[in-house]
């Protein structure tokens, strides 16, 4: 099932499968989100929960039981309950149940996704609550994909990623298998812009740490058109696209947690987490994305 809201600038459609934004159009009717061509990448803007990235061996253990865990958790692949779709807001919820606890994660949780339109900005808030009697630890992040180029008159090299100040991000190495190697390096030093090319992501994503910038955006050079994500407060931000030529979309991904390392233990309790909630506690984060198109 899908729900749609709109204002004078934007029309947003969210699917209850994965609580995923599947369409965002501007006032001219132009589609701003990647439309999930399965030949390139079959998603639009998935939620990453209760972990980000991959797990060593694709599994983890709790109390001696092994659970299978695919990339980026399981919230993106499950049906969420639509709570509200009116005015400028869509709200959905995913609750743990017996099947989830038996097969995916043996802890109680409530994940609420709230989308709100505010002028040319989409605010997407993820709230995690622990209704159970045990500690809840989790990872979480965003993975929106934006159409590139903005129109048929432009090509890949007309675009660049920009920070709001010069940056020398620390790149956390997770190549070639998506697990952290323990190595890090500098790809760019004291740069405010990263030129987009068809080969930029030939070796997969760039996971950046140590950023001071409040925003990361994809800019069309010389026109003023841009999409900017507020990444303030996020310890990690990734940029990525599928290895298609020419580039069809770009992702800007603020994360509160990291993929597992190659040497991580199997025990879930020993994995690094975005947060660890005691019974009754809750936690939330918001990604605000502004579309100047």
Label each residue range with its predicted role:
Residues 66, 70-119:
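Extended, loop-rich substrate-binding clefts of extracytoplasmic carbohydrate-active enzymes
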Residues 226-293:
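Active-site pocket scaffolds in enzymes
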Residues 5, 96, 101-151:
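Acidic, contiguous internal or C-terminal segments within carbohydrate-active enzymes
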Residues 83-90, 116-121, 150-153, 220-222, ...:
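A short, structured loop/turn motif at beta-sheet edges
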Residues 14, 60-68, 126, 275-292:
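Short Pro-Gly-centered flexible turn/kink motifs
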Residues 11-66:
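Acidic-aromatic substrate-binding/catalytic surfaces of carbohydrate-active enzymes
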Residues 148, 152-232:
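Active-site/ligand-binding surface loops and adjacent short beta/alpha elements
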Residues 1-8:
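Short, Gly/Pro- and small/polar-rich lid/capping loops
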């Amino acid at each position: 099932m899908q729900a749609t809201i709109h204002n004078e600038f934007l029309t947003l459609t969210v699917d209850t499968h994965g609580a995923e934004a599947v369409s965002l159009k501007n006032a001219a009717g132009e589609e701003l989100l990647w439309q999930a061509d399965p030949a390139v990448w079959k998603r639009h803007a998935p939620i990453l929960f209760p972990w980000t990235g991959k797990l060593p061996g694709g599994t983890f253990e709790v109390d001696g039981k092994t659970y299978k865990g695919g990339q980026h958790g399981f919230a993106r692949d499950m049906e969420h309950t639509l709570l509200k779709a009116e005015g400028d807001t869509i709200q959905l919820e995913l609750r743990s149940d017996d099947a989830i606890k038996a097969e995916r994660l043996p802890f109680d949780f409530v994940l609420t996704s709230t989308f709100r339109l505010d002028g040319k900005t989409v605010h997407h808030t993820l709230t995690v609550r622990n209704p159970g009697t045990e500690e809840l630890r989790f990872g979480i992040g965003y993975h929106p994909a934006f159409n590139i180029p903005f129109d048929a008159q432009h090509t890949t090299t007309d675009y660049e990623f920009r920070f709001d100040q010069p940056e020398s991000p620390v790149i956390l190495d997770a190549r070639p298998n998506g697990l952290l190697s323990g190595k890090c390096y500098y790809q760019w030093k004291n740069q405010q812009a990263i030129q987009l090319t068809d080969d930029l992501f030939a070796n997969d994503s760039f996971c950046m740490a140590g950023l001071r910038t409040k925003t990361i955006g994809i800019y069309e050079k010389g026109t003023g058109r841009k999409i900017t994500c507020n990444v303030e407060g996020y310890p990690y931000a990734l940029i990525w696209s599928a290895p298609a030529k020419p580039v069809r979309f770009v992702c800007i991904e603020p994360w509160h947690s990291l993929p597992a390392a190659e040497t991580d233990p199997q025990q879930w309790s020993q994995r690094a987490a975005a947060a660890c909630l005691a019974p009754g506690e809750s936690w939330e984060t918001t990604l605000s994305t502004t579309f100047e198109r």
